[in-house]
Curated annotation (Swiss-Prot):
Job description of the protein: May play a role in lipid transport protein in Schwann cells. May bind cholesterol.
Tissue/organ expression: Detected in spinal cord (at protein level).
Gene source species: Equus caballus
Disulfide bonds: 118-125
Family statement: Belongs to the calycin superfamily. Fatty-acid binding protein (FABP) family.
A single GO cellular-component term on record: nucleus
Gene: PMP2
Any Pfam family matching the protein: Lipocalin
Name of the protein described by the UniProt record: Myelin P2 protein
Phylogenetic lineage: Eukaryota, Metazoa, Chordata, Craniata, Vertebrata
Length: 132
């Protein structure tokens, strides 16, 4: 994994996040809180274990994983998923699977910013983070 992903990132823009959360099945109350949250994401690495910690006024979450190995994840909206993160073409690609559903979260670096594309069925959300 490129060390360029490592560090602290702050959300600066978000498009279609409410629609994405609806597609995930997130209720109105949780969506309202999620839309207000301006998360900070901290990506670190120790050996071959990558940790992504997301901190916000809504909820803090943390996942630690090895590339290509499935792990159990409890998401900020309390979904229990089987997740796998891979690296391809300079992008960190995360797939979450639960109850017959699947969503993808792709992270890539563009002009020094981390662009995160979240997809569920035909709904796509784009969130942009700047390094702090």
């Amino acid at each position: 994994m490129s060390n360029k992903f490592l560090g602290t990132w702050k959300l600066t823009s978000s498009e279609n996040f409410d629609e994405y959360m609806k597609a995930l099945g997130v209720g109105l109350g949780t969506r309202s809180l999620g839309n207000l949250a301006g998360p900070t994401v901290i990506i670190s690495k120790s050996g071959d274990v990558i940790t992504i910690r997301t901190e916000s006024g809504f909820k803090n979450t943390e996942i630690s994983f090895k590339l290509g190995q499935e792990f159990e994840e409890t998401t900020a909206d309390n979904r229990k998923t089987k997740s796998t993160v891979t690296l391809a073409g300079g992008k960190l690609n995360q797939v979450q699977k639960w109850n017959g559903n699947e969503t993808t979260i792709k992270r890539e670096l563009v002009d020094g910013k981390m662009v995160v594309e979240c997809s569920m069925a035909s709904v796509v959300c784009t969130r942009i983070y700047e390094q702090v």
